[in-house]
UniProtKB/Swiss-Prot annotation:
GO biological process terms, semicolon-separated: phosphoenolpyruvate-dependent sugar phosphotransferase system
Source organism: Staphylococcus haemolyticus (strain JCSC1435)
Main localisation: membrane
Domain called PTS EIIB type-2: residue spans: 425-519
Record flagged with keyword Phosphoprotein: yes
Protein name: PTS system mannitol-specific EIICB component
Topology of the protein relative to the lipid bilayer: Multi-pass membrane protein
EC number: 2.7.1.197
NCBIfam families the UniProt entry points to: mtlA
Keywords noted in UniProt: Cell membrane, Kinase, Membrane, Phosphoprotein, Phosphotransferase system, Sugar transport, Transferase, Transmembrane, Transmembrane helix, Transport
Upper lineage: Bacteria, Bacillati, Bacillota, Bacilli, Bacillales
Topological domain spans for side Extracellular: 53-56, 164-172, 301-320
Physiological role: The phosphoenolpyruvate-dependent sugar phosphotransferase system (sugar PTS), a major carbohydrate active transport system, catalyzes the phosphorylation of incoming sugar substrates concomitantly with their translocation across the cell membrane. The enzyme II CmtAB PTS system is involved in D-mannitol transport.
Domain PTS EIIC type-2: 19-351
Known catalytic reactions: D-mannitol(out) + N(pros)-phospho-L-histidyl-[protein] = D-mannitol 1-phosphate(in) + L-histidyl-[protein]
Gene behind this protein: mtlA
Length: 519
């Protein structure tokens, strides 16, 4: 019974992670639009850095129309590619026009995937039944009719529901703010970050509500709750001073990556090594939120990534010191509590490598920065098992891992010399989101090709679920290769342990030159 309950809890956690990951896939590609809107609002509105009545008119339409439509398009495209995105964006206009005074981000996050899924089902039904020669007619009219129906439904049905939901959430936040209880949110948010459940909270609640508040009040504290780098740097500073061995040695580099790069996951293994440090990050987070609430601080747009540099750039006029104070006090409290815990408690039984593997298992995939903490191959097995669980497989861990290994062996994913590269002119790096680690890997390989004089091979990056059917050569981290194979089974697949440091790149480079010289 206890084992069944544990499995159910793990399954629920995976579902929340998957949900958060999907929300993140809609929001993160559009962060640039949020930042552009934030700059326009911060600089040109009446109380901005350089007020300009003419240019300030851009802010309203951008947050009312542009950003919700971009989110809806991204959500629809995730489900049914370009066609799903276009129909989803069109249908979302119904919700936007029905509630023009409320930035309809939440409505776009619902309407986008929903309409994309409906378009996919309509196409699956119609395509086998479409007479030859009528394909364009059926395709265009089916998309147009579905967009028409869903736009009307969005206007009449979804908009009132969204208005009610936004009202309830806003009242809840206002209640916490009024009673000065907003800092208690950190009790949920800070542990959720380390358990990788934060995306569902951050992108599902804070971003829509924060955007709504920023549009009406000019800024929102909700953008500063989860992204504050203070609690994390406090933990790492404690390790720099009181840590030992590998944890101490790696904490310096981790601190730079976390504080200036905004990659918070780099400090998660340090907390997992000593679970009592959850107390430190919670108290640090609460201190930061309490400071911002007391000073009335907030950002005009999402501070993403959670880097101190981004915080400096996004700080509203006249509130730079408030921003610094919130980060400093959060870091100070986190550091003091962590230092006391490390000084007066026993050394952890698990080392940093074990904690990193635990973090990757919790995340359900290989971390793009974990190699900075451990050896290149650390945690691969644990992450592979977790990835299979996240995909909904109900087999036991051993059999799941064996199946994955068999699939990789069948494709010779670790034997670069086993493939023919004579017809390869396009290499694709693929990761979960298609933005972070794969982009860095692709950039590095492009530089290697340039130095080697290989100019006729294009190197790009994308998300695994957006790999094109005609992909020729796909490079993924080992824990994600099985998903890539299932997505494009006819491509050559190469597994690496770390996108930024793999000996297989040199092997690939030599094989490409050799095979293409023969051709």
């Amino acid at each position: 019974m206890a084992q069944t309950e544990t499995q159910e809890k793990k399954g629920l956690g995976r579902k929340v992670q998957a949900f958060g990951s999907f929300l993140s896939s809609m929001i993160m590609p559009n962060i640039g639009a949020f930042i552009a809107w934030g700059f326009i609002a911060a600089i040109f509105i009446d109380n901005g850095w350089y007020p300009n009545k003419e240019l300030s008119q851009l802010a309203g339409p951008m947050i009312t129309y542009l950003i919700p439509l971009l989110i809806a398009f991204s959500g629809g495209r995730l489900i049914h590619d370009l066609r799903g995105g276009i129909v989803a964006a069109t249908a979302t206009m119904g919700v936007i026009v029905a509630l023009p005074d409320t930035p309809m981000l939440l409505g776009a996050m619902i309407m986008g995937p929903l309409v994309g899924w409906l378009m996919k089902k309509v196409d699956q039904f119609l395509q086998p039944r479409t007479p030859q020669g009528f394909e364009m007619l059926f395709n265009n009219f089916s998309a147009g009719i579905l967009a028409f129906i869903m736009t009307i439904l969005g206007f009449k049905l979804l908009a009132p529901i969204m208005q009610f939901i936004m009202h309830i959430l806003s009242v809840a936040v206002e209640f916490l703010v009024h009673l000065h209880l907003l800092p208690i949110v950190s009790i949920i948010v800070e542990p959720a970050k380390i358990l990788f459940l934060n995306n569902a909270i951050n992108h599902g609640v804070f971003t829509p509500l924060g955007t709504d508040q920023a549009a009406s009040a000019g800024q929102s504290i909700l953008f500063a709750i989860e992204s504050n780098p203070g609690p994390g740097i406090g933990i790492l500073l404690a390790y720099m001073i009181f840590g030992k061995g590998t944890a101490k040695a790696t904490s310096y580099g981790a601190g730079i990556i976390h504080f200036f790069g905004g990659i918070h996951e780099i400090y998660f293994p340090y907390v997992l090594m000593r679970p009592l440090l959850f107390i430190a990050v919670i108290l640090g987070g609460m201190t930061g939120v309490a400071t911002y609430q007391a000073t009335g601080f907030g950002f005009k747009s999402p501070a993403s990534p959670g880097s101190f540099i981004v915080y400096c750039l996004n700080a509203p006029k006249g509130e730079f010191l408030h921003m610094v104070l919130g980060v400093f006090l959060a870091a100070l409290v986190s550091f003091v509590v962590a230092a006391l815990i490390m000084k007066f408690t026993k050394e952890p039984k698990q080392d940093l490598e074990a904690a990193t593997a635990k973090m990757e298992s919790t995340k359900g995939k290989k971390s793009s920065v974990s190699s900075k903490l451990t050896g290149a191959t650390t945690g691969t097995g644990a992450a592979g098992v977790a990835a299979n669980k996240a995909n909904g497989e109900d087999q036991n861990e051993a059999s799941s891992e064996d199946e994955e290994e068999d699939l990789l062996d069948n494709y010779n994913t670790e034997d670069v010399d086993a493939h023919d590269y004579s017809n390869v002119d396009h290499v694709i790096f693929a990761c979960d989101a298609g933005m972070g680690s794969s982009a860095m890997g692709a950039s590095m390989l492009r530089n290697k090709f340039k130095k080697a004089g290989i100019s006729d091979v294009n190197v790009t990056n994308t998300a695994i679920n957006q790999l094109p059917n005609n992909a020729q050569l796909v490079i993924t981290q080992k824990t994600l290769t099985d998903r890539a194979i299932k997505q494009v089974p006819n491509a050559i697949h190469i597994s690496v342990d770390n996108f930024l440091n793999s000996p297989r790149y040199e092997e690939l480079l030599n094989n490409l030159k050799k095979d293409q010289d023969k051709a």
